[in-house]
Amino acid sequence: MMTRGATRMTRTVLGHMGPRYFSTAIFRNDAGTGVMSGAAVFMHGVPANPSEKAVVTWVRHFPVMGSRSAMSMALNDKQHDKKAENGSAAATGGGDGGDEKSVVSYWGVQPSKVTKEDGTEWKWNCFRPWETYKADLSIDLTKHHAPTTFLDKFAYWTVKSLRYPTDIFFQRRYGCRAMMLETVAAVPGMVGGMLLHCKSLRRFEQSGGWIKTLLDEAENERMHLMTFMEVAKPNWYERALVFAVQGVFFNAYFVTYLLSPKLAHRIVGYLEEEAIHSYTEFLKELDKGNIENVPAPAIAIDYCRLPKDSTLLDVVLVVRADEAHHRDVNHFASDIHYQGQQLKDSPAPIGYH
């Protein structure tokens, strides 16, 4: 840091060098002040602002440092005027808004107001009424793909090996177990859809609808997670575990899908079979009364089109049916690859719920 003496010396040197290297003759008399004031009247149509007069005085006495300070003062005036305009615009547009805060943007992008079928206002921004569905609970939950090839057996036993540490860690806490399961299950659809999207761009070809199907699967699993977050309140170490598991699984599945899509889809198919088993055990605990059958979260009622008096048991039934549909889709995708074809060669089961 510079000492006070050094600071004074620097100011003195700059004061002597200023008149030689920075011409300030125009500002050294009253005519210069008149020029500045006249320029302000010409540019703005109004007499000079106090800060503009201060600029003249500052530049007259401190010719070297004046340019930077003059710019700062001018910017302050502009910011002040802009704040005043924004304040008047907000006061004009406040009208019927009440206490709701709306973002006023130059780009004019305004969210549309959505209503339900009965005319009431739709309160969710994370999904819209046309994205909701009514699950098919009649789907066969017992279907199983018997592993025959080496890759099938590898996928099957990989998923089985992941089940044991999960059983040890969560034991009978099926709410937290479901939360962990959904954070993992939402990854494959996003990874597969992303890679198919990039492949479609590289090869200038259609995807057969599989990009949308896989991304819809990821979104459906994410909504399951949002539902169970309302039921199970995870601890800090469970959140840390989710963070670690998701990071490892995302990268592992990404590499697996690049090397062998049929193996990747088969793994997800077996993972969904395990999810069906977990939710079946969840339902047994609810039936026994070991887990309180609380009212269904509002987000699940609207997303799955459940009755208003639905409970957690109804939510688990719907989620289990969703997992069965994801099981079928991923085993089907793996079978397409096993038959030597690409996913784009077979139409995707869009909207298969």
Swiss-Prot record:
The keyword Membrane applies. Its main location: mitochondrion. The chain crosses the membrane at residues 178-198, 240-260. Induction: Up-regulated by acetate, citrate, antimycin A, cysteine and H(2)O(2). Residues 1-69 form a transit peptide. Stimulated by reduction of the disulfide bond and the presence of pyruvate. Its cofactor is Fe cation. GO terms for molecular function: alternative oxidase activity; metal ion binding; superoxide-generating NADPH oxidase activity; ubiquinol:oxygen oxidoreductase activity. One of its GO terms (biological process) is alternative respiration. InterPro entries: AOX, AOX_sf. Fe cation 1 binds at residues 182, 221, 224, 323. Its EC number is 1.10.3.11. Keywords: Disulfide bond, Electron transport, Iron, Membrane, Metal-binding, Mitochondrion, Mitochondrion inner membrane, Oxidoreductase, Respiratory chain, Transit peptide, Transmembrane, Transmembrane helix, Transport. It is found in: Mitochondrion inner membrane. It is a multi-pass membrane protein. One of its GO terms (cellular component) is mitochondrion. Belongs to the alternative oxidase family. Catalyzes the cyanide-resistant oxidation of ubiquinol and the reduction of molecular oxygen to water, but does not translocate protons and consequently is not linked to oxidative phosphorylation. May increase respiration when the cytochrome respiratory pathway is restricted, or in response to low temperatures. This is Ubiquinol oxidase 1, mitochondrial. It comes from Nicotiana tabacum. The gene is AOX1.
